[in-house]
């Protein structure tokens, strides 16, 4: 994904205005905090955490936005040998339209560009949509664990090497 790209898969929900994938900017912080709250409720990141990942150069934050409305975001820490996808949030009204798949494909491409051999992420065990998306894209459960009273799964995808995809 380029820094700025028009997003086309069924993106015109209420208007003909296209959604665009681009890097997050500091001006997006209120929208990112709100998107995180809508998607993750009590487990949402603090405004300070969002400020850090948007401003710090080692993090990559990609948003899909229609005008000023941020409808999805991913937060990636590209590194080798393993890259971590720290968050992938899609507003409920934009789910099942290819938005999450676009952000996941972008994360995979960025991890490969960082020479990572693995891409890892964590997902709640009671989030079948996210688990299904990740499985379809080649992720497998590496471990299950209890965190803050919720069962979660670490999922990983091998990106290259002798047995990689």
PLM ranges: what are they?
Residues 3-8, 23-93, 104-106, 110, ...:
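Acetyl-CoA-dependent GNAT
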């Amino acid at each position: 994904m380029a820094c700025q790209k028009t997003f086309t898969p069924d993106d015109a929900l209420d208007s003909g205005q296209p959604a665009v994938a681009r890097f997050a900017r500091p001006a997006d912080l209120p929208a990112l905090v709100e998107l995180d709250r809508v998607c993750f409720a009590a487990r949402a990141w603090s405004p300070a955490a969002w400020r850090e990942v948007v401003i710090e150069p080692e993090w990559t934050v990609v948003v899909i936005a229609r005008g000023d409305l941020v409808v999805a975001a991913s937060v990636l820490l590209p590194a080798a040998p393993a890259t971590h996808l720290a968050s992938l949030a899609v507003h409920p009204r934009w789910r099942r339209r290819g938005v999450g798949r676009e952000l996941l494909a972008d994360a995979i491409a960025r991890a490969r560009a960082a020479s990572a051999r693995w891409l890892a992420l964590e997902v709640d065990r009671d989030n079948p949509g996210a688990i299904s998306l990740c499985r379809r894209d080649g992720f497998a459960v590496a471990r299950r664990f209890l965190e803050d009273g919720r069962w979660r799964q670490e999922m990983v995808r091998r990106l290259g090497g002798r047995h990689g995809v």
